[in-house]
């Protein structure tokens, strides 16, 4: 194996700016920014979405009807079809 070809693996602080949460995670990401957290200095990366802010993980996900397209069609236009059959 070749020596010194792998990027350095270190603890990095990711900051979810949408909910102001910080995560310490092992990563090889490169950044010039640093932050002091818990008395230590870590590389710092901002992110827009994390498990603390994504609707799927927070339970604020919109649920769509599990019905098929035919059921939705009947729900929307069923009154017209029934009225025409009775006439």
UniProtKB/Swiss-Prot annotation:
Keyword Ribosomal protein among record annotations: yes
Q: Name one GO molecular function term.
A: structural constituent of ribosome
Q: How does it assemble?
A: Part of the 50S ribosomal subunit.
Name by which UniProt lists this protein: Large ribosomal subunit protein bL31B
Q: Does the keyword Amino-acid biosynthesis apply?
A: no
* GO BP: any one term: translation
Enumerate the SUPFAM superfamilies for this protein.
Answer: L28p-like (SSF143800)
Identify the InterPro entries for this entry.
Ribosomal_bL28/bL31-like_sf, Ribosomal_bL31, Ribosomal_bL31_B, Ribosomal_bL31_sf
Q: HAMAP family recorded for this chain?
A: Ribosomal_bL31_2 (MF_00502)
Q: Which family does it belong to?
A: Belongs to the bacterial ribosomal protein bL31 family. Type B subfamily.
Task: Supply the alphabetized keyword list.
Answer: Ribonucleoprotein, Ribosomal protein
**Cystine connections:** none
Q: Which organism is it from?
A: Klebsiella pneumoniae (strain 342)
Q: Which GO terms describe its cellular component?
A: ribonucleoprotein complex; ribosome
Q: Which Pfam families match?
A: Ribosomal_L31 (PF01197)
């Amino acid at each position: 194996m070749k020596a010194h070809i792998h990027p350095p693996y270190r603890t990095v602080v990711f900051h979810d700016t949408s909910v102001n949460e910080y995560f310490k995670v092992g990563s090889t990401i490169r950044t010039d920014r640093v932050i002091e957290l818990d008395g230590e200095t870590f590389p710092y990366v901002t992110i827009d979405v994390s498990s603390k802010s994504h609707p799927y993980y927070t339970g604020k996900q919109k649920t769509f009807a599990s019905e098929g397209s035919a059921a939705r069609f009947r729900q929307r236009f069923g009154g017209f079809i029934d009225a025409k059959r009775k006439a």
